[in-house]
Amino acid sequence: MHGPHPTVKDIELSLAPEDVPVQCNVQLDEEDYTNVEEPAQQAYRVVTLCPKCSSPLRLVVECSHADIRALEQLLLGTLTVVCPRCV
């Protein structure tokens, strides 16, 4: 509509929304969601002393670099590993 007053010829009554194809059952390829990259696992040997009898303890864990850092923080904090004889 142009001008100060609308006229009948400016009004369209046959407006309809465009047809848009909608696919509701779209499935992803298996590789799209199974290729989540896991952090690299590596074996780490932890050697410490039993806090009760001072005997050496050896612990082998397999984890990511971030997880071994978390274990290190736990061992430096309040977590203690004791030998089976001292339990």
Swiss-Prot record:
Origin organism is Human papillomavirus 28
GN (gene name): E7
Keywords assigned: Activator, DNA-binding, Early protein, G1/S host cell cycle checkpoint dysregulation by virus, Host cytoplasm, Host nucleus, Host-virus interaction, Inhibition of host innate immune response by virus, Inhibition of host interferon signaling pathway by virus, Interferon antiviral system evasion, Metal-binding, Modulation of host cell cycle by virus, Oncogene, Transcription, Transcription regulation, Viral immunoevasion, Zinc, Zinc-finger
Identify the residue span(s) of motif Nuclear export signal.
68-76
Instruction: Name the chain's protein.
Output: Protein E7
Q: Which GO terms describe its cellular component?
A: host cell cytoplasm; host cell nucleus
Q: Which family does it belong to?
A: Belongs to the papillomaviridae E7 protein family.
- What does the entry report about post-translational modification of this chain? Highly phosphorylated.
GO function terms (MF aspect): DNA binding; DNA-binding transcription factor activity; protein domain specific binding; zinc ion binding
